[in-house]
Amino acid sequence: MVTETNPARTATDMLLVNRAADRAVEGLTLPIPQGARVFVDETYFQAENARYALSAIRAALSEAGYAIVRERGEADAIFEVRAGALSLDQLRRVVGIPDMRVPINESLNVVSLPELSLYSNRDRMGVAEFSGFLYDARTGMPLGAVTPMIGQYKIRSHKAFMMITWGQQLAQPGERDPGSSWKEF
């Protein structure tokens, strides 16, 4: 017997958001000398997929030459991070009649009608925005702020005459950048 699961988020959804997080932290630096010991305070970083994004922030700081510490008491500086967005946006354009749900009686039972289109496209975009500020671990004095780190990762798919499809339907594991779709409309 084969068991099929229906997770709350698809693998493509998770990959889009995680890749946006990776892009948001590219080139992250702090206004302190390299080699400084930094504690990443995640108290105000609340979002779905927060663990992945926080790991991406730590990896970017480590790559930039900072020593990441696990305890506040070991740090020269505290980097308090917060999430502005870490989610998925979707946009669908249809030339024709989009799929819809139509009530069929007073009980509000509905019937689903399929899309009847000449052309449609669908954009799915992972969006990540983080910011934070840095303060001295001993004195609490501010050392600087990190302006919003913004990352996006988008795939676009197209459909003509309800059957002919092209473009990227899924984000593939290990794939880094799909580039632009064959034709962008």
What role is predicted for each listed range?
Residues A59, E63-I68, R72-M141, M149-F185:
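Surface-exposed short loop/turn segments
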Residues M1-S62, Y66, Q169-F185:
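A structural "domain/chain start" motif
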